[in-house]
C-alpha cells in the first residue's frame, strides 16, 4: 500500500463521496469523485482508503462520524489516504466515469452482506464462494485371465468414472498401491475494486447488495475421463505392496475394492452415513468426516429459503442476512428477480433501482441531479435543494439561512427582489 497526504483548500464542497465505516464492517474509502472537483485535481482516486481525517485515525469511525468530521473543517481539509502501488490501469488524474449515482434513502441503511460461504465444505473458504466439491468413486474388476509374470500387462483399462474434486477416487487391484492426489492451487486474491469496475457504485453506504453462490451437484464424467482415471490407477504393483484393509470392517479385501478419501472399502460397505445407500456408482459429499449421498446431503445441510421455506439446491441468493431462491427475492413493485444487483429497502420491502428512483427518488430543484445520501440539502418553495444550489437566480449569491424572495418559483436576494426573471 502507498500512503499519501492531501490538503484541500476550503470552503466545501470537497468533491468526493465516502463509503464504508465501522458500522458497515469495511474500511472508509472514496466511492465517487466530482469531475473537475478539488479531490480529483489533487490526485485522489476512486477506491483509495481513507486513513486519517485532520490527523485523527478513521479505524474506529462510523460513516456518520467521518462525515461530521469532514463537515467540521471549513478552511482546509487534511486527509491521509492509501492506494495500491501496483496494478493501476489508469494514469494519474484520469478516472473512469460511473454510469449511475447513488440513491437518497430516507430509511435507515441496511448493513452490507458479508462474503458468501458455499455449502458442503468441511472448512469454509475465507474469502470467496466456491462450488461444493463432489467425488465419484470408481471400481476396478481384476481380469479373469491369469498371466505369467513375464507377460503381465502394464495397465488394465476398465470402465469407471472420474470426479471433479481434489480428492482422487479410483478402483485398483488388491495389490496395487494408491497414488497420492496432487494438491490444487487457487487463484491469487485481488482487491474487489481492481477487478470490479462497479464496486464503488454497488457498495455505496445507502445501498443494499446481494451475493449469489452455487450449490453444485455431482457431475457425470465422460467415458474418456473414466478410462484415463483407471489407466493411471491400475498399474502393476510391486512385490512389496501390502494387501488393502477395509476401513469400515477392518478386514482384508480380496477382489474388488474402492479407494476414497485415502481409505480402502469393500464396494458394498461404502455407503451413505444417513440412508446407508451404496455409493459405488453415484457421487458423494464428505462433511466432518461423514459421507453422504447427494439427496441426504441436500436434506441435511442445504439452506432453507427465507420466503418459501424450501431447501435450496441450485443458485443461492444471500441478502438481508438470509438465504433465498433467486425467483423468491424480487422487487416489491415490478416482481423482477433482483439477483446480484443493488436494491433499496422501503417500509421493509426491497425495490430495484429503477422503481425506487421513480417512486421515492428526490432531485434537486436547482441542478436537477439526485440528492445523494449524506448530501446537505434544504426545503424551500415546496422543493428540495442542495445547500450549494439554493442561490439567487440573478446574481448566484448563496441564500442558505438568509432572507429571500421568490418569483416564478425561483429564489431572489433582497437586491434583486423586484427584478425581472
Curated annotation (Swiss-Prot):
Its Gene Ontology cellular component terms are: adherens junction; filamentous actin; stress fiber; Z disc
Q: Where is the PDZ domain?
A: 1-85
The annotated regions of Polar residues compositional bias extend over 147-172
State the InterPro entries in the record: PDZ, PDZ-LIM_domain, PDZ_sf, Znf_LIM
- Which key words tag this protein in UniProt? Cytoplasm, Cytoskeleton, LIM domain, Metal-binding, Repeat, Zinc
Known function: May function as a scaffold on which the coordinated assembly of proteins can occur. May play a role as an adapter that, via its PDZ domain, localizes LIM-binding proteins to actin filaments of both skeletal muscle and nonmuscle tissues.
Q: What is this protein called?
A: PDZ and LIM domain protein 7
Source organism phylogeny:
Eukaryota, Metazoa, Chordata, Craniata, Vertebrata
Amino acid at each position: 500500500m502507498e500512503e499519501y497526504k492531501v490538503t484541500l483548500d476550503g470552503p466545501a464542497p470537497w468533491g468526493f463521496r465516502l463509503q464504508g465505516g465501522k458500522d458497515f464492517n469495511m474500511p472508509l474509502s472514496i466511492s465517487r469523485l466530482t469531475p473537475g472537483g478539488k479531490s480529483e485535481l489533487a490526485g485522489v482516486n476512486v477506491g483509495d482508503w481513507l486513513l486519517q481525517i485532520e490527523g485523527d485515525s478513521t479505524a474506529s469511525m462510523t460513516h456518520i462520524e467521518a462525515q461530521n468530521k469532514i463537515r467540521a473543517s471549513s478552511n482546509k481539509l487534511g486527509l491521509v489516504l492509501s492506494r495500491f502501488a501496483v496494478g493501476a490501469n489508469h494514469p494519474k488524474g484520469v478516472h473512469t466515469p460511473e454510469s449511475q449515482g447513488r440513491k437518497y434513502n430516507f430509511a435507515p441503511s441496511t448493513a452490507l452482506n458479508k462474503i458468501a460461504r458455499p455449502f458442503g465444505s468441511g472448512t469454509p473458504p475465507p474469502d470467496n464462494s466456491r462450488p461444493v466439491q463432489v467425488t465419484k468413486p470408481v471400481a476396478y474388476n481384476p481380469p479373469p485371465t491369469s498371466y505369467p509374470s513375464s507377460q503381465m500387462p502394464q495397465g488394465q483399462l476398465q470402465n469407471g468414472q472420474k470426479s471433479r474434486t481434489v480428492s482422487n477416487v479410483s478402483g485398483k487391484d488388491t495389490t496395487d498401491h494408491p497414488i497420492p492426489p496432487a494438491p490444487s492451487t487457487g487463484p491469487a486474491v485481488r482487491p474487489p475494486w481492481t477487478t470490479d469496475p462497479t464496486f464503488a457504485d454497488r457498495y455505496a453506504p445507502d445501498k443494499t447488495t446481494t451475493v449469489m453462490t452455487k450449490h453444485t451437484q455431482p457431475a457425470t464424467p465422460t467415458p474418456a475421463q473414466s478410462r484415463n482415471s483407471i489407466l493411471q490407477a491400475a498399474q502393476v504393483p510391486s512385490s512389496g505392496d501390502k494387501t488393502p484393509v477395509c476401513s469400515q470392517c477392518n478386514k482384508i479385501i480380496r477382489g474388488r475394492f474402492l479407494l476414497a478419501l485415502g481409505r480402502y472399502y469393500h464396494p458394498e460397505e461404502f455407503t451413505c452415513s444417513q440412508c446407508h445407500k451404496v455409493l459405488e456408482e453415484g457421487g458423494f459429499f464428505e462433511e466432518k468426516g461423514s459421507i453422504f449421498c447427494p439427496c441426504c446431503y441436500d436434506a441435511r445441510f442445504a439452506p432453507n429459503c427465507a420466503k418459501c421455506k424450501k431447501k435450496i439446491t441450485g443458485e443461492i441468493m444471500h441478502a438481508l442476512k438470509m438465504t433465498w431462491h433467486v425467483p423468491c427475492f424480487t422487487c416489491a413493485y415490478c416482481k423482477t428477480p433482483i439477483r446480484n444487483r443493488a436494491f433499496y429497502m422501503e417500509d421493509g420491502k426491497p425495490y430495484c433501482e429503477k422503481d425506487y428512483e421513480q417512486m421515492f427518488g428526490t432531485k434537486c430543484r436547482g441542478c436537477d441531479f439526485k440528492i445523494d445520501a449524506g448530501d446537505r440539502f434544504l426545503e424551500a418553495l415546496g422543493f428540495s435543494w442542495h445547500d450549494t444550489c439554493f442561490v439567487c437566480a440573478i446574481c448566484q449569491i448563496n441564500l442558505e439561512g438568509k432572507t429571500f424572495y421568490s418569483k416564478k418559483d425561483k429564489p431572489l436576494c433582497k437586491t434583486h427582489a423586484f427584478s425581472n426573471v
